[in-house]
Amino acid sequence: MKSTLQESIDRQRNILKGWLATSLSLLAQDCKQAWPQRGALEARLIAGLAELPYCKYLYLLDANAQQITANASRAGLIESYYGRERSHRPYMAEALAGSPLSLSDAYISQNARRPSLTAVQVIHGDKGELLGYLGADFDLRELPATQALYQQPGQWLQLKGDPAIRAGLFH
């Protein structure tokens, strides 16, 4: 079962990464044109949420992974995130190492304590210099259902449970 589940997770990640690649690349190009005007960047992020229906938050970071915009959400801008230093967050590791588009492993978000994924798109200037990063956060609970990706094995399967619970059930 474990390999089947892992294969399903890998397929889901590849599908999500493929879906995000074009959308985030286009949004990053638009942001590059407005760089570094905060108001114009935040307006573009708010508009970008319409192009990413399952995205929870969009934000921009400078080349040092310091947040240069508020978080854009469907409810508007969340100012408290402006200036946040994100270089040490696990989802930044691939991007800081040079990956043009990275998709994090699942993690529990630091503030909202929700299961999350973060995609990070690198943004380069016209001369190839690193301007910064576009971050897109997703709540795993809000992503489309994945039943088609994972089929439960047809045979009955018993999983080992907590002995204390099992003892209480079968007496």
Please provide the spans of the model-predicted regions.
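Intrinsically disordered, low-complexity terminal regulatory regions
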Residues: M1-I68, L149-H171
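Generic structural signal for well-ordered beta-strand positions
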Residues: I68-T69, L131
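Sensory/regulatory domains in signal-transduction proteins
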Residues: R74-A75, E79-G154
